[in-house]
């Protein structure tokens, strides 16, 4: 019975981490004053780009780099549409969702069902993993999960306890005041949108390269919408 509970709790953390990466990305984007409804589409693009790279290169580092570049590219496009062209955020977000969902399914069809034999394996932390119950749940996870243990408090500290975080909040709440203070509102929004999409892309990689070891169209299964709703 205890083993079952430990397994369920450990699995819940794995599931939650993929949602958290997307949620943090959306948080920074919305704090910057830009709502991104295309979270799910960006996640799928991150998932498929990372998996395709893993299949063809068998290099996890290179796969992760491609995931980051995919997120950055999508973020740049979204920032251009919403910040430079000042297009409707809802329409652009839905367009990103449809684009990401469709393109990921198209480019991923050749690797659907193909095993990459490469993923972020679970790593037991010495000493901490020996703690009864908690060690099995929290300290026998993959690198992306361990990174999230630090990203959450660091993000909170950045947003609420630093000068840059104050500017970020002003960027969303009163951009005119920030502009009057001599800050480049456009450049800051570009940066945070790109960063947000990179986090969303990592979220997709969590699904295809950590939680599982395969690619299937639509495999994020609504996690992007859950992240958006939580934010």
PLM regions and their residue ranges:
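Interfacial loop-to-helix junctions that mark the boundaries of transmembrane helices
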Residues: 2-10, 61, 86, 134-145
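Short alpha-helical transmembrane interface motifs in multi-pass membrane proteins
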Residues: 6-11, 59-64, 196, 213, ...
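Residue-level signature of the transmembrane alpha-helical core
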Residues: 12, 16, 20, 64, ...
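Helix-loop-helix "hairpin" substructures at the membrane interface of multi-pass membrane proteins
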Residues: 138-214
């Amino acid at each position: 019975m205890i083993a079952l509970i430990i397994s369920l709790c450990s699995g819940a953390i794995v599931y939650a981490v993929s949602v958290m990466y997307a949620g943090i990305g959306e948080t920074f984007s919305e704090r910057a004053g830009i709502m991104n409804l295309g979270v799910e589409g960006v996640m799928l693009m991150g998932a498929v780009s990372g998996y395709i790279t893993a299949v063809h290169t068998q290099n996890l580092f290179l796969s992760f780099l491609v995931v980051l570049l995919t997120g950055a590219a999508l973020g740049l496009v979204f920032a251009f549409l919403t910040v430079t062209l000042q297009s409707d955020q809802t329409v652009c977000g839905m367009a990103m969702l449809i684009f990401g969902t469709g393109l990921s399914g198209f480019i991923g069809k050749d690797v659907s069902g193909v095993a990459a034999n490469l993923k972020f394996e679970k790593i037991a932390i010495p000493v901490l993993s020996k703690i009864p119950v908690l060690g099995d749940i929290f300290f026998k996870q993959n690198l992306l999960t361990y990174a999230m243990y630090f990203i959450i408090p660091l993000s909170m500290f950045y947003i609420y306890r630093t000068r840059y975080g104050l500017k970020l909040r002003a960027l969303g709440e009163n951009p005119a005041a920030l502009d009057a203070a001599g800050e480049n509102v456009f450049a800051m929004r570009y940066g945070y949108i790109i960063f947000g999409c990179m986090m969303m892309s990592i979220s997709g990689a969590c699904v295809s390269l950590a939680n599982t070891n395969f690619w299937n169209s639509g495999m994020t299964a609504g996690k992007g919408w859950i992240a958006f709703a939580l934010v």
